[in-house]
């Protein structure tokens, strides 16, 4: 609730500034403030739990959106008039010549608009691969196999997918926060020999509200031009929530365009995969849900996956934990998401640093890596203990204490799981009704 109220207060503050600028005829400033405020109001609507409050915010959202679109039209006409005036001063015959008989200005405007839309989407194309391999993801075997079937196989063996046998065109990954949905998408981007478009609702909504549906259309056009391609939409629920009376016209248009493009009406969409991710799949519009042919539940990791997660996250940091210790830690973290385990490991990795900071005594030990004598934190009663602190040590004198299972147990006590039973129950119910297991 505090999140919704924070978004609401920020949105109201920005909208009030927009109204002040609007009244003072500073229309360009007002336009930007309106849309910044609308972004926050949209987030407030998403997280508001009280139905009456939600309806009130929605009605205000629609009112301010209408005014913002009016200002946008006014500013565009103003810019067009200015451009026309400048061209007439600089020689209108030159402009006519470039347009042939002078009737081609509409096409030029269309080209300019298309360039603008493509420019807005340019950042969505991943030119560098994220370097996340399938082996970096613990568990989720069913989800990985489904993604390989939809993404890797059709590119590597196109002869397998002919006639009525076609690869999946829409996959929805859903589950509690921190279970690895976006991480799976990164693995797809790394492993697939395809153009990867990564967008969120803000890329398609908050740039230009009035042109959002054209932005969606251009996204799919670019994907078809560069196929095989993958469109990854994170937090797809923010873009495709259920229909209702309080839904804004802009939101409705975006959703309609997305449905049309995902359906491939009038276009050849073979070779384009839409990959969606959401934490709240039950908030998806039913028609959008149907467009995602496969809906895969990314559940909390089991004990085997958590064991592997501890090993992966520790990496090459010096550690005295045995395979049995990793298993013990995995059993202690039942109910933890992949992100929760990563947080525990990050906390544990800092424990040796904290020992160094808090130590009052250090003793000499031989560093096995270079055979030199160095100093490491110890108890005052240890043999050879010297009273000193870390500030007294030279940079190359310090030998960091190794990680032990005690460091991890302490970190587990400090970091509790972030997913509750009620959230899991909703995902299980959705899976029983519409989805499939991804573990």
Swiss-Prot record:
Predominant cellular place of this UniProt entry's protein: membrane
GO molecular function: ATP binding; ATP hydrolysis activity; protein homodimerization activity
Annotated segments matching region Disordered: 76-113
Keywords: ATP-binding, Endosome, Membrane, Nucleotide-binding, Virulence
Domain MIT: 8-75
Keyword ATP-binding: yes
Highest taxon of the lineage: Eukaryota
GO biological process, one term: protein retention in Golgi apparatus
Phenotype when the gene is knocked out: Leads to defects in endocytosis. Displays a characteristic class E vacuolar morphology and multilamellar structures consistent with an aberrant prevacuolar compartment. Missorts several vacuolar proteins to the extracellular space, including carboxypeptidase (CPY), vacuolar protease A (PrA), and vacuolar protease B (PrB). In addition, certain soluble secretory proteins, such as invertase and acid phosphatase, are missorted from the pre-vacuolar compartment (PVC) to the general secretory pathway prior to exocytosis. Also results in a decrease of canonically secreted proteins.
Single GO cellular component term: plasma membrane
Variant or mutagenesis effect after changing residue 102 to S: In allele: CaO19.11814
UniProt subcellular location: Endosome membrane
Outcome recorded upon mutating residue 4 to V: In allele: CaO19.11814
Stated induction or repression of this protein's expression: Expression is regulated by GCN2 and GCN4.
Cited function: Pre-vacuolar protein sorting protein involved in the transport of biosynthetic membrane proteins from the prevacuolar/endosomal compartment to the vacuole. Required for multivesicular body (MVB) protein sorting. Catalyzes the ATP-dependent dissociation of class E VPS proteins from endosomal membranes, such as the disassembly of the ESCRT-III complex. Required for extracellular secretion of the secreted aspartyl proteases SAP2, SAP4, SAP5, and SAP6. Its regulation of the pre-vacuolar secretory pathway is critical for virulence.
Homology family: Belongs to the AAA ATPase family.
UniProt-recorded name of the protein: Vacuolar protein sorting-associated protein 4
